[in-house]
Amino acid sequence: MPPKRKSSPKGKTPTVVDGLSTEEMSKEQLEEHIMRLREELDREREERNYFQLERDKIHTFWEITRRHLEENKCELRNRERELEEVEERHQVEIKVYKQKVKHLLYEQQNMLSELKAESIISTKLLQDEHADLEKEQWKDMRSLKLELKQQELSSENVLKRIHLKHDEETTDLRNDFARQVQEIGSKYEKRMQKLRQEEELRRKTEIHEIEERKNTHINMLMKNHEKAFRDIRNYFSDIVYKNLDLITSLKEELKEMKKNEEKRNKEMAEVLEQNKELKESSQKAKEQVAELQKQLANYEKDKSILTRSRARLKMSDREMKELKWELEVLEQRFSKVQLERDELYMKFTKAILEVQQKSGFKNLLLECKLNTLNDTLEKKEAQLSEVLSASNLDPTTLSVVTHKLEEVLESKNHTIKDLQYEVARVCKAHNDLLKTSEAKLRAFGIPVEELCFEPLKSNGQSVGQGPAMFVSSSN
């Protein structure tokens, strides 16, 4: 039943409906009027209930959205915590790798020490062999001196025995001996010339073949090394530049998303204020509901965009960490290569100085030996000529002396030829080593003018052009 009407105060003007007051209406008109009022009341109640339901829905949706926001914040904190843990684990792994690198460097240092010790031992062995060879040469010189002394004694005895012969045979013997000496000299000169030409041709052929093989191999290795180094440097440079640009763009997008999120938070506050105002006016509430629905759609869209952006940011951070790790590894490798280059440069400089000293000393010794032998040979030839000119020899004794003289001359010529070849080979190896070292220094970008010494170039006999250090090592 409808609620009872309150009694109107006295003197109140009666209600007018359709131009008639309620007192003037009939019963049927009053009933119709009451029915209309009841229908209007029902409509107003239905509208009130509808707006209350809409208000409850909006409030519920706001609560759900707030809970989702809190859950997302919790998830974001968890993700940040996980990222911190991953970063800590990554730092631990980096320390482990650094320790491994230290161990590898220590092993490399030990290996270099062993190689250095082996090189010292091999150098000592070579020095011992050189000393033994020098001792053998001194023994040969002593035996040769003894033979010459014996020959002098025998010549003196022969001179005493044949001094009593006639003076007429002296002239014939001198002429015959001069003729034989000239024939022997021409014969052995032709033979020596032929042997020199054959040995020179064979040596030049071998040197040329070795030069071609080694130069081809060295050029191929240098080209492959330069190509590989250039490719890997270009590859990592492109990767670093591309990822830096991508990280910068993603950071800018993240800043923009944060601004949008702040804007959406402000809009949510405004929505709460608008919900309070819904109680005042139903029409205003309808308009605000439509506006809120639009804002909600925009919020969902921005929320999905923010989720995708965070995923992209996470992926970019992971890629950036990987690139940082690769960059650190490359920097370590680069520093290691620089250290190796400096060590090789120091060793190379030291080796050049040692080779210069050894080759200079060896050249000096060989030249001194050669000069000594030449002087000795000239003296002996002069003494022998004087003895022969002052004595009268029979043909048998003369043939014996001539045969021994030929043997002595042949051995001396062989010794002189070997010493000359050794001097020329050492000079050539020294000069080619200087050329090869200068080429290597230019290949590594080190100017030759910055060396702390002046390379000593030998002026010895040339035996061909090419990497003669390989010939010397093989010999």
From Swiss-Prot:
GO terms for cellular component: ciliary basal body; cytoplasm; extracellular region; Golgi apparatus; microtubule; motile cilium. It comes from the Eukaryota. Residues 1-22 are annotated as: Disordered. Pfam families: GAS. Residues 1-113 are annotated as: Regulates microtubule-binding. Residues 20-104, 142-200, 242-426 form a coiled coil. Disruption phenotype: Morpholino knockdown results in attenuated Hedgehog (Hh) transcriptional responses and impaired early muscle development. Morphants exhibit developmental abnormalities, abnormal ear development and defective cilia motility. Residues 114-257 are annotated as: Microtubule-binding. Keywords: Cell projection, Cilium, Coiled coil, Cytoplasm, Cytoskeleton, Flagellum, Golgi apparatus, Microtubule. GO terms for molecular function: microtubule binding; small GTPase binding. GO terms for biological process: axoneme assembly; cilium movement involved in otolith formation; flagellated sperm motility; muscle cell development; otolith tethering; positive regulation of protein localization to cilium; positive regulation of smoothened signaling pathway. It is found in: Cytoplasm; Cytoplasm, Cytoskeleton; Cell projection, Cilium, Flagellum; Cytoplasm, Cytoskeleton, Cilium axoneme. Component of the nexin-dynein regulatory complex (N-DRC), a key regulator of ciliary/flagellar motility which maintains the alignment and integrity of the distal axoneme and regulates microtubule sliding in motile axonemes. Plays an important role in the assembly of the N-DRC linker. Plays dual roles at both the primary (or non-motile) cilia to regulate hedgehog signaling and in motile cilia to coordinate cilia movement. Required for proper slow muscle development and positively regulates ciliary smoothened (SMO)-dependent Hedgehog (Hh) signaling pathway. Belongs to the DRC4 family. Component of the nexin-dynein regulatory complex (N-DRC). Interacts with microtubules. This is Dynein regulatory complex subunit 4. The lineage of its organism: Eukaryota, Metazoa, Chordata, Craniata, Vertebrata.
